[in-house]
């Protein structure tokens, strides 16, 4: 591995740095965007059961808010459960926007890495080409220099794509996951509002 890094030259280091950041972000988002963490199945029914038993007590609100993003949304609704339907819905929407923003955390960075990695690889390619052509004039010059320039160009191009392709795949996956989870939370919040106001059984 170290021999590859040496052959790729100094332009490879920004790509290595970007790959480490991308890997860390991918692992963090895989862990944080799990269904069981964001919007557990059956949470609304459990919250409504607790509401019927204890009412909208501060303990219930605090307990619900600690159950992840969906819990925060439902807690906002419970805090206004005795208010008119539009007020309760507005409170849920306000918190919902904040929760949706939190779910998208780090995705901009991951998307930027996916877009920039090929450009960093292209930069390494240009550096390698400069080394190749810069070593041409003198007759009988060291043949190792052009070979090193070729390796710099090819390794950086390849590594740029290696970083960019998985980053883009996971970026698209996480965007779709966030949209799906946001829709799920919206449906659960609507269910809470309708059940709390007797509009649904």
Identify the role of each PLM range:
Residues 1-44:
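Hydrophobic membrane-targeting segments
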Residues 2-3, 135-148:
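Membrane-interfacial hairpin junctions
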Residues 9, 23, 59, 74, ...:
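Residue-level signature of catalytic and energy-coupling elements of molecular machines
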Residues 12-25, 111-118, 124, 163-167:
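Alpha-helical transmembrane segments of integral membrane proteins
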Residues 38-123, 127-141, 170-201:
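Predominantly long cytosolic amphipathic alpha-helical stalk/bundle segments
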Residues 108-113, 144-157:
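Cytoplasmic-entry segments and transmembrane alpha-helices of multi-pass inner-membrane transporters
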Residues 152-169:
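Hydrophobic alpha-helical transmembrane segments of polytopic membrane proteins
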């Amino acid at each position: 591995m170290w021999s590859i890094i040496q052959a790729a030259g100094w332009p490879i280091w920004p790509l290595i740095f970007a790959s480490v950041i991308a890997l860390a972000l991918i692992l963090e988002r895989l862990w944080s965007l799990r269904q069981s963490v964001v919007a557990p199945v059956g949470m609304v029914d459990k919250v409504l059961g607790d509401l019927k038993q204890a009412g909208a007590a501060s303990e219930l609100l605090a307990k619900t808010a600690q159950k992840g993003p969906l819990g925060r949304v439902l807690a906002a609704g419970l805090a206004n459960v005795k208010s008119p339907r539009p007020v309760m819905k507005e409170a849920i929407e306000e918190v919902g926007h904040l929760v949706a923003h939190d779910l998208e955390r780090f995705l901009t960075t991951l998307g930027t890495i996916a877009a920039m990695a090929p450009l960093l690889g292209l930069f390494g390619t240009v550096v390698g080409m400069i080394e190749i052509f810069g070593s041409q004039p003198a007759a009988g010059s060291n043949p190792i220099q052009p070979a090193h320039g070729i390796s710099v160009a090819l390794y950086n191009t390849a590594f740029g794509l290696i970083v960019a392709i998985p980053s883009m795949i996971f970026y698209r996956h996480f965007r779709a996951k966030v949209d799906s989870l946001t829709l799920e939370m919206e449906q659960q919040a609507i269910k809470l509002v309708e059940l709390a106001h007797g509009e649904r059984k």
